[in-house]
Amino acid sequence: MARNWSFRVIFVSAMWCALLKFATLEEPKDGYDYTEGCPFVVLGNGTHAKPAGCSHLCNGAPETLDDNMECYNVTEEVAKRMTPDIPYTCWLGWCSKGECKRDNRTEVCYRGSERE
């Protein structure tokens, strides 16, 4: 009886691993190529993250985020100099033509550690 039980555990484990492999290899269905470009610097607030600014240079070419995307009104240079895991007060804004247009709201934000 113990032999039959161990076979079932091994079989279920193998099936679970196969399912995970195929589930994680699936390509995104939105048509966007996530392998191109340079990642934007993001700052967190404990529940989600937003980009620092709305544009940057990627291999000498400008990249901009879509209009009406929420952002932190902080340049990437300033965000990179922030001490990791220390809370800061950041102005919120909305991307408009590559610029984070500040509104009258602030929230706590922080730069994550490099290991994240």
Swiss-Prot record:
Keywords tagged on the record: Disulfide bond, Glycoprotein, Secreted, Signal
Disulfide cysteine pairs (residue numbers): C38-C58, C54-C95, C71-C100, C90-C109
Signal peptide: 1-25
Glycan-linked positions: N45, N73, N104
Gene3D superfamilies cross-referenced by the UniProt entry: 2.30.130.100
GO MF entry, a single one: C-C chemokine binding
The protein's role, per its UniProt record: Salivary chemokine-binding protein which binds to host chemokines CCL2, CCL3, CCL4, CCL8 and CCL18.
Protein name, per record: Evasin P1180
Organism (species): Amblyomma triste (Neotropical tick)
